[in-house]
Amino acid sequence: MSEILIEEIKDQIVVKDEEIDVSELEVKLNVTKPVGYDTVVVIEGAPVVEEAKQQDFFRFLSSKVLAKIGKVKENGFYMPFEEKNGKKMSLGLVFADFENVDGADLCVQELDGKQILKNHTFVVRKLNQLEKAFSTPDEFSFEEREFKEREHLRSWLTDYYGRDQFISYYGNRVSVNWNRKSDVPEQIVDRENWTETYVQWSPMGTYLVSLHLRGIQLWGGESWGMCARFLHPYVKFVDFSPNEKYLVSWSYEPVRLPPIGHPARETMPFTDDDEGKHCFVWDIASGRILRSFKIPPQPEGSKDGKKVIWPIFKWSADDKYLARVTVGQSISVYETPSLALVDKKTIKIDGVQNFEWCPVSDALGRDSKEQLLAYWTPEITNQPARVALISIPSKSTIRTKNLFNVSDCKLYWQSNGDYLCVKVDRHTKTKKSTFSNLEIFRIREKNIPVEVVDLKDVVLNFAWEPKSDRFAIISANDQVLNSTNVKTNLSFYGFEQKKNTPSTFRHIITFDKKTCNSLFMAPKGRFMVAATLGSSTQYDLEFYDLDFDTEKKEPDALANVQQIGSAEHFGMTELEWDPSGRYVTTSSTIWRHKLENGYRLCDFRGTLLREEMIGEFKQFIWRPRPPSPLTKEDMKKIRKKLKDYNRLFDEEDIAEQSSANRELAARRRQLISEWQKYRDEVIARVAEERAITGQPAITVPAEEEEIIQETVEEVISEEIEPVED
């Protein structure tokens, strides 16, 4: 094509700028117009003033309100006016043009929602934000997402052998494994750089939590895919509600939002109200932020001012309430999912130090919707120390107990909510010696009586046996507490109920001259480990059975406590029972020291089953199990057949000893599963056909059991004999 022809075509093409519509392209590319309003803020809620007084009000804003925030440009204030009764009156709006963007951003952060004057609360926004709000379309259009079925998040509970899983974190690798007693663990998944700090399980074991510089990730299902993600930069701590509905995250660093108009701001879950906050409460199902909080006041004596007592919030048993204490002042109780304060105000309690929720939701009766909360306050001037029980949401005081000469208190709820033990550390009037006693609230009884267990020593540790009225304590004389080799006493107590005599907690037995300082009750009760943790020279483990079987055991005895084993794990830093209460793991982690890092697995008697020395070992955590769905009747039926189950389990243990037997057993289970599936389909089809033809359904009488017998043929020997013609 000749150049002359091209020039002729260009002359014929006439395009006017006003005819070009690029609005759709601007919306698609999220183009921000350079309007130059980044430094302008709009303040709503200002006092209504006459036009003659506007300069006085501007001077008040500059010198009193905005002096520590930023400098406003010369003639940078503007107030719109309207005519009222012959006078020009302001509309309660003020425009302020700052010298830089930082001043405008800080003004929004510091003044928005704050009561600046007695009857005036400011609402502050940047002018760019208002422009964006005005451009919001009248009709909302949403993008439809294709439904994807989720994996079964509790599939591990269907394991044929009923095994438990655990996490092993070493170096930069995280692995999930099946426990196989003394055999090498069966690895399920192993990933590199799965987390950047540490890992943890949710309370029921549904999710595995990994923490990263940008936030939190939840993992689960058979494929261990990502279930949820929560953006929280530099997150340090995570806590779940008991039923895994909500999640609380906390970071040393407050959240900072990108400048208005920045593309990254649109992808963040945070609003302007969340800026500068450290703690966030999330709804796990939706991924929404329910509420954000600023960092609480730091404890006195913290070296760098970055110490925090975790968890900041404590949850009620039913996930309905979470509460936080402001030491010395109040307890704030929030209701989910709105996260609004109950009755819109905190519970003012002078001197309050700590509180604990009752671990069950029916402590006040099955029909009651009230949750029980216990707190304590120290002695203040002429007022005694006090322990109180209050119900939420009514905030009614259920029971109080005054205490004297108190140094400290610790609250210990029994797992069923039947008892609350308050460990009270007391001092003599001369304050030269200290001792402890136990104030036990019997929650289920009328008027909640309080029983006092007096002791001569200082109680160092306390532990209830799960779902029981027995407990153990470690105590020592206050004169030897500061010595290098402290000898402690291990004591057991139980609740005695006899006819014609008052019920009371009675001492059972004491083991003296021990070195233990920590107690770990098995999740199912009966067994306990007394350990020495935190020492640089002693790493003792002692295993106890509270119901040791002997011929001399008295039928009405509260317990028959017997030491059934002992062990030592050099460098031990952590101890944990598995969810079944059959195994105990002790670990030595690199976060404390670099000596013989790894873990040991023992049974409940203390017999060593397996030991693994792993360099840069960081964590060993058993996967929790949700509460059992079995009823008391189901449990009784299982106990009746326990001998049959034991015989079956022994046979399976023998079969599992070789890999060939394991493969054969797995193949048989697969065939039985396929046959059972086919059988269920046939039964359903036959039932449908009988219903169509009017025939009654085939049922098995309730008093009879359906028995499926499997016949397995095995070749014991094979011999070939020649046959003569």
Curated annotation (Swiss-Prot):
One of its GO terms (molecular function) is translation initiation factor activity. It comes from the Eukaryota. Its main location: cytoplasm. Signal peptide: none annotated. It is found in: Cytoplasm. The modification Phosphoserine is found at residues 23, 135. It holds the Pfam family eIF2A. GO terms for cellular component: cytoplasm; cytoplasmic stress granule; cytosol; eukaryotic 43S preinitiation complex; eukaryotic 48S preinitiation complex; eukaryotic translation initiation factor 3 complex; eukaryotic translation initiation factor 3 complex, eIF3e; eukaryotic translation initiation factor 3 complex, eIF3m. The keyword Repeat applies. Residues 630-671 form a coiled coil. GO terms for biological process: formation of cytoplasmic translation initiation complex; translational initiation. WD repeats lie at residues 190-229, 304-344, 347-386. Keywords: Coiled coil, Cytoplasm, Initiation factor, Phosphoprotein, Protein biosynthesis, Repeat, RNA-binding, WD repeat. The keyword Protein biosynthesis applies. Residues 39-129 form the RRM domain. SMART domains: RRM_1 (SM00361). The modification Phosphothreonine is found at residue 136. RNA-binding component of the eukaryotic translation initiation factor 3 (eIF-3) complex, which is involved in protein synthesis of a specialized repertoire of mRNAs and, together with other initiation factors, stimulates binding of mRNA and methionyl-tRNAi to the 40S ribosome. The eIF-3 complex specifically targets and initiates translation of a subset of mRNAs involved in cell proliferation. Component of the eukaryotic translation initiation factor 3 (eIF-3) complex. The eIF-3 complex appears to include tif32/eif3a, SPAC25G10.08/eif3b, tif33/eif3c, SPBC4C3.07/eif3f, tif35/eif3g and sum1/eif3i. This set of common subunits may also associate exclusively with either moe1/eif3d and int6/eif3e, or with SPAC821.05/eif3h and SPAC1751.03/eif3m. The eIF-3 complex may also include SPAC3A12.13c/eif3j. Belongs to the eIF-3 subunit B family. PANTHER family: EUKARYOTIC TRANSLATION INITIATION FACTOR 3 EIF3 -RELATED (PTHR14068), EUKARYOTIC TRANSLATION INITIATION FACTOR 3 SUBUNIT B (PTHR14068:SF0). HAMAP family: eIF3b. This is Eukaryotic translation initiation factor 3 subunit B. It comes from Schizosaccharomyces pombe (strain 972 / ATCC 24843) (Fission yeast).
